[in-house]
């Protein structure tokens, strides 16, 4: 049995310098975005015109190139997206990394042979989700960062998919593809590459109505960075790719991280020197953790003291003498290094600067290191106070060393084998890189009178590959007693290297079938009927209130799914229909939760994951399935896909503004859309449990004592708004926007578009508030109330006011 291939080292590239840094430091593949439709819109990214040369370089160096097209695409953008994809395909990518399943359909229709990788934005956490991905032509999935190695092992045992995991870099506190915070608070969508990083901002914790004093801990949902270099041996047999986050980071970061993970993969038993770890910390670090790979530990994931890149910890100020600060070093320090003083208020403009001098025992030195006690001075910086922490934020010498690794072609080279043989009176030489072969000849050969060509001599001459990307690996010579002038041999070597470069750069190309989008677009039908109101309830009291308001479609999303069994008979007794929501995230070993929801006896299910779709289609084909917002349906290709898989109707993506919403409704059957017209937007959806992290000493659900059952908690933001925190049955937390949003002003227009299903979502309303809210929207749909009037009433009656949400946002 052949040994399993080692996982690839997959490096990020936000610009061309990062590409070079990745290549020269041993990356097997790089991933990068174009200037639109990628999840790192703030990166420099690449123009379409740059792609042919970029892919030619990557092919030459034997490095794969993956294009991230990993955002949602709206209906009114699909034609442009198709034209863009045609240009990318013409450049010869090795794979696309995708979020939008409609775009996967489009690419597969355009060029069926193109490899597709499911982005972490698809929130893939279970093998059940991979059934649909396989149908769409995906061969690899980038797993959610919230999975442990044990969970990855379970997934691996149940699928033949290639698995990719993030091994290093920044961690999102929310599940990728499920974070609506930037959209809710700033009108800029993380699903469109415009994350505003609200997780890196300070929050106060309000417990049962009172501010909890947490000291300096303000950054309650800002996780440490992932660093899994020591876990690589455990991942080697599970994944095909180790991914480094960082398309917004520097080339030096790419160089340092790539070479570290290259070493980890090449030598699974490798240990890492202090200097190697310090280099990782220096290029970018908020502090390192294994993330969720080692299992859940809510106490370790978030420290809460700072959201900033800190670099390397040097020590604490032990004394101040004039402009000098004294510290016992934990890491190297030298003149020219950049430092910052940390006094526990990272939101302030912290003092710091370049170190001008370092003294050890009153003598100036060029370098000091642990455990030296030193004094140092910083140019034009006020003196610190005793007890302040000191961080080294930059190390110019280290950055010069890292930059030197990619400023010239001196790093990873392509191995070449040579065959040298006689062909009549000619010398024939063949170069092979394992895929391509080039041949050349020179001569005429001469009988050797004194010094015939030897294998060692040929290796010496043919191995002088200089600035080419090649290195001679094996050489086989089949020669008699002959010789050839060295000038001819050198000329032949140069020509063969040039020929090999040319064939390696060549674009194999993809045959693109025209008209793909037109073939996929179905002519929409139109389902007629009276407007229907569904109310999503979060407690049994909410259910009673909605029924009292005359609502006949009840949807339930309870923290405790055991209480579904109390809600179902209440609803059925009134002749109404009830739909139950399983937890949004489904992991290996959690099928029991889905079965418990089914056992409550609902009329249907709110499908919030493709795992739900797979399970309930098989286990209960009689149920009515409603696709929820978390499926991220933003265009007709995605919507039609889900509806064709058994959904009765589908909630469109919350990322759509009014213009984009209209474009979608024009391309689908609007009678099969269910539109949420009132809600508190679910912003962060997290594996990290704030309840456990702060209100207990527990690491996870097994030892936290479930403070979520005993306390009402909100997070108070920088504007004074208090956002509700809820935990579901899987202990995953959701933070809901404090300010409700209403689309009452758009309801009349939606009816004109053909929309027939509307939803109102409750959160923490009292039974009377819930009843009145349901009644107001029921009256609106029945024409007894005006949308503008209802908007004003809601705005006046709510302490926090009300917003229009994404529909009111202009692009």
Give, region by region, the residue ranges found by the protein language model.
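Surface-exposed amphipathic alpha-helical tracts and adjacent flexible/coil segments at the periphery
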Residues: 1-24, 29-40, 54-55, 61-71, ...
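Conserved non-cysteine loop/helix-boundary elements of the Radical SAM core domain that shape
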Residues: 41-45
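Glycine-rich, highly charged phosphate/nucleotide-binding loops
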Residues: 46-51
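Active-site PLP-lysine loop of aminotransferase-like
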Residues: 125
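Short, conserved phosphate-binding/catalytic loop or strand-edge motifs used
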Residues: 128
């Amino acid at each position: 049995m052949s040994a399993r291939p080692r996982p690839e080292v997959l490096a990020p590239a936000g610009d061309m310098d990062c590409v070079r840094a990745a290549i020269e430091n041993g990356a097997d593949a790089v991933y990068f975005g174009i200037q639109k439709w990628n999840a790192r819109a703030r990166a420099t990214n690449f123009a379409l015109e740059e792609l042919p040369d970029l892919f030619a370089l990557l092919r030459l160096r034997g490095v794969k190139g993956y294009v991230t097209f990993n955002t949602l695409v709206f209906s009114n953008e699909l034609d442009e997206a198709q034209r863009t994809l045609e240009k990318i395909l013409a450049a010869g990518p090795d794979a696309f990394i995708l979020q939008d399943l409609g775009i996967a359909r489009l690419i597969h229709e355009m060029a069926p042979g193109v490899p597709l990788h499911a982005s972490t934005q698809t929130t893939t956490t279970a093998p059940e989700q991979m059934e649909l991905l396989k149908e769409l032509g995906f061969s690899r999935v980038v797993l959610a960062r919230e999975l442990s190695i044990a969970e990855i092992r379970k997934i691996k045992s149940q699928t033949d998919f290639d698995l990719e995991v993030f091994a290093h870099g920044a961690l999102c506190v929310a599940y990728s593809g499920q974070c609506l915070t930037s959209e809710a608070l700033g009108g800029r969508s993380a699903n469109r590459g415009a994350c505003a990083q609200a997780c890196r901002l300070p929050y106060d914790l309000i417990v049962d109505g009172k501010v909890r004093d947490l000291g300096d801990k303000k950054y309650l949902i800002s996780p440490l960075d992932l660093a899994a270099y020591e876990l690589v041996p455990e991942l080697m047999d599970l994944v095909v790719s180790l991914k480094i986050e960082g398309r917004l980071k520097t080339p030096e970061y790419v160089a340092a991280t790539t070479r570290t993970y290259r070493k980890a993969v090449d030598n699974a038993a490798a240990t890492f020197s202090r200097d190697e770890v310090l280099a990782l910390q220096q290029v970018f670090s908020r502090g390192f953790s294994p993330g969720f790979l080692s299992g859940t530990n809510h106490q370790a994931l978030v420290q809460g003291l700072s959201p900033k890149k800190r670099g390397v910890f040097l020590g604490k100020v032990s004394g101040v003498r004039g402009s000098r600060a004294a510290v016992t070093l934990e890491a190297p320090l030298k003149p020219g290094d950049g430092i910052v003083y940390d006094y526990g208020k990272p939101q302030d403009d912290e003092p710091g600067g370049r170190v001008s001098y370092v003294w050890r025992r009153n003598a100036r030195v060029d370098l000091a290191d642990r455990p030296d006690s030193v004094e140092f001075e910083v140019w034009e910086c006020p003196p610190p106070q005793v007890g302040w922490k000191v961080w080294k934020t930059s190390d110019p010498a280290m950055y010069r060393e890292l930059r030197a690794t990619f400023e010239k072609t001196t790093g990873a080279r392509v191995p070449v084998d040579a065959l040298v043989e006689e062909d009549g009176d000619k010398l024939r030489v063949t170069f092979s890189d394992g895929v391509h072969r080039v041949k050349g000849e020179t001569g005429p050969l001469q009988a050797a009178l004194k010094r015939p060509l030897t294998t060692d001599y040929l290796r010496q001459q043919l191995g002088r590959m200089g600035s080419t990307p090649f290195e001679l690996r094996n050489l086989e010579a089949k020669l008699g007693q002959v010789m050839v002038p060295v000038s001819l041999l050198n000329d032949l070597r140069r020509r063969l290297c040039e020929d090999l470069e040319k064939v390696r750069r060549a674009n194999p190309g993809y045959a693109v079938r025209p008209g793909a989008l037109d073939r996929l677009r179905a002519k929409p039908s139109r389902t007629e009927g009276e407007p229907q109101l569904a109310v999503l309830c979060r407690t049994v009291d909410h259910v009673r209130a909605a029924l009292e308001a005359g609502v006949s479609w009840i949807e339930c999303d309870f923290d405790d799914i055991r209480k579904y069994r109390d809600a179902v008979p209440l609803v059925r007794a009134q002749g109404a229909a009830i739909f139950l929501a399983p937890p949004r995230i489904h992991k290996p070993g959690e099928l029991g939760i889905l079965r418990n929801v089914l056992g409550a006896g609902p009329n249907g299910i709110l499908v919030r994951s493709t795992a739900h779709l797979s399970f309930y289609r098989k286990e209960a084909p009689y149920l009515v399935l409603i696709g929820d917002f978390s499926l991220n349906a933003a265009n007709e290709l995605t919507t039609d896909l889900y509806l064709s898989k058994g959904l009765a109707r589908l909630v469109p993506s919350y990322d759509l503004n009014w213009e984009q919403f209209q474009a979608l409704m024009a391309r689908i059957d609007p009678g099969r859309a269910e539109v949420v017209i009132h809600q508190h937007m679910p912003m962060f959806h997290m594996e990290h449990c704030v309840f456990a992290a702060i209100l207990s000493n527990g690491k996870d659900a097994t030892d936290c004592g479930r403070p979520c059952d005993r306390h009402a908690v909100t997070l108070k933001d920088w504007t004074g708004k208090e956002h509700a925190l809820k935990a579901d049955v899987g202990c995953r937390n959701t933070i809901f926007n404090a300010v409700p949003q209403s689309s009452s002003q758009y309801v009349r227009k939606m009816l004109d578009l053909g929309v027939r299903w509307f939803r109102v979502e409750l959160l923490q309303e009292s039974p009377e508030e819930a009843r009145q809210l349901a009644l107001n929207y029921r009256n609106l749909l029945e024409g007894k109330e005006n949308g503008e009037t209802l908007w004003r009433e809601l705005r006046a009656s709510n302490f926090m006011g009300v917003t229009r949400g994404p529909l009111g946002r202009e692009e």
